Structures are given as structure tokens and as C-alpha cells.
């Protein structure tokens, strides 16, 4: 085992996804890339792929629209309004303190991937955070557990290639209590 003594950065990112194993009503597959300039973390570039049932209304409204057509911009704005109303469904922590986000994403869009709608956006931090020697944790989840938001594999959270040797990522999935799972099962669409 080789110890790297001169490492300028040690970033351990614990990504926690809360998955309601009992009976969520909607599913979103997450992918996230950290946005950095090499020394500071400025945001999270997210890709949310919705399940086919959740996607159905959006794709119906989009019809045969081509990527970049006006309808995709309109649909993306509608979905982002909901995401913003829920604080991006994301919490970001540093040293036990919540890190604030900017009120609006710096970019966002919607597209089709087969029979699934895909929302992409950059979730900007209100203030860039230093990377060197720091530990950050972020969680993306629906607090009602109506929507299962999860990473399929650890490689769904990525760093820029320039940080691969100096930073680490770990993805952790929450283990929900029986009480929480039962609550998730009891939810109706009006409760979400």
C-alpha cells in the first residue's frame, strides 16, 4: 500500500440516495458529475432519467419534437419549476453545515431517451467550495418517498478526470425503517 503524503486534495463524497423499497410510485435514475475548476467545487451536473410511466405525459406532450425544439424548453421549464420548489430534491453538506444552492440552475433541458424523459441541469452552489482536504456529502431524495430517486451503480457519480488521483467518491444507499416504508406505501398522488 502506497501512502500519498503530498496529496493536495482529499475529497470523500458520500452520496446518499433514499430508496423506498416498499412501493414508490415513480422512479428516477440519477447520474451526477461534480462541476469544478480543479480547486473549487461549484456545482453538480445532474441527469435524471424518469421511468416510462412517469415519462408518458411528458413524451406525449413532446410528440415527435426534435432535440432543442421549443416544446422541450417548455416542458423542461415546467419540470424545473417543480424541482426548484423542492430545493432540487437535494441536500449538500460540508462540516455538518448545509451548503446553499443558487435559486436557479445555470442551465437545464429535457430530452427523450427511447421511452423515457430525461431532465438535465446544473445545480450551482451559492458559493464555490474548496476541494483540498475537504469532505462533502450530498443526498438526492424525495422526502415523501413517493419517488424512488437512486443511482444504479457507484460509477453514476463522477469526478472530472483531472481529480481522479486526488479525490474519492462513495455512493451509499439509505436503509429505511419499516415505519418509513409503510408510510411510503400509504401515499397517494395527492400526498406527494
Language-model segments: what does each one mean?
Residues 29, 43-47, 91, 118-122, ...:
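Ordered hydrophobic segments in well-structured contexts
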Residues 52-129:
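Structured domain cores in non-transmembrane regions
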Amino acid at each position: 500500500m502506497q501512502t500519498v503524503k503530498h496529496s493536495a486534495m482529499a475529497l470523500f463524497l458520500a452520496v446518499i440516495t433514499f430508496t423506498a423499497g416498499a412501493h414508490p410510485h415513480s422512479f428516477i435514475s440519477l447520474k451526477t458529475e461534480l462541476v469544478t475548476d480543479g480547486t473549487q467545487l461549484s456545482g453538480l451536473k445532474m441527469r435524471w432519467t424518469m421511468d416510462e410511466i412517469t415519462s408518458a405525459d411528458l413524451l406525449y406532450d413532446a410528440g415527435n419534437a426534435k432535440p432543442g425544439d421549443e416544446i422541450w424548453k417548455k416542458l423542461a421549464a415546467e419540470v424545473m419549476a417543480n424541482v426548484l420548489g423542492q430545493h432540487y430534491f437535494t441536500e449538500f453538506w460540508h462540516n455538518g453545515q448545509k451548503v446553499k444552492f443558487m435559486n436557479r440552475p445555470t442551465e437545464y433541458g429535457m430530452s427523450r431517451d427511447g421511452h423515457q424523459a430525461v431532465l438535465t441541469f446544473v445545480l450551482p452552489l451559492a458559493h464555490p467550495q474548496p476541494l483540498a482536504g475537504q469532505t462533502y456529502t450530498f443526498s438526492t431524495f424525495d422526502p415523501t418517498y413517493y419517488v424512488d430517486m437512486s443511482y444504479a451503480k457507484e460509477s453514476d457519480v463522477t469526478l472530472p478526470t483531472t481529480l481522479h488521483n486526488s479525490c474519492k467518491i462513495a455512493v451509499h444507499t439509505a436503509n429505511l425503517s419499516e415505519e418509513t416504508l409503510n408510510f411510503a406505501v400509504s401515499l397517494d398522488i395527492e400526498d406527494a
